Amino acid sequence: MASRMGPRRSDWALPTGLIALSVVPALAGTVRLTELARGAVITAANERFFAMPLPVVLHLLTVIPFSMLGALQFAPSFRERHRMWHRRAGRVLMACGLIAALTALWMTLAYPWPVGDGEALYLERLVFGSAMLLSLVMAIDAIRRRKFAAHGRWMIRAYAIGMGAGTQVLTHLPYYLLVGRPDESSRAVLMGAGWVINAGVAEWIIRRSSTPRAMVFPTPASS
């Protein structure tokens, strides 16, 4: 009994960690959505969202389920037991990821820079937002060609970039505790570090296995 349960429990270590990593950004996003829905005092930090709420609302409504559903795709035993759910969730995950990436780029290009942002962070947002979008497009192309291993690799890359906000909480926290509020240059480094760390971990996961499991099952047309 214990030997059978051990691998099953270990299957949930990574998904649990990823969900935990999503909690702070998800809570912050929920607070933002509540402010926009109910109204809040307009400040320099939020006035751009009230002036043009559509991109941030679409982004938050898609990036939160993207992070949560994506985490469950890393539980092999769960995928095997719930293949139909896995297939359907994969479609939702793909749609959410595309909208999240597109709206991230939209916000970067359309919103005025908040205090603390600068050219370096602006370029980082464009680069990693574009990389996430490209990864998702490549994942779609791979699944249409029934290249399941390639599909899995591209989805891992897209998910890693999409989870950048969670890792950025961890890169910022020590700086806040030891130094204080970061200036423009420090903020760019800390934000960039979150994306780079995630991208590095994604490549490590991919290279660790020569045949990574596809995160999303093929569509009915290709199954």
Region locations from a protein language model:
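Alpha-helical membrane insertion/targeting regions
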Residues: 1-223
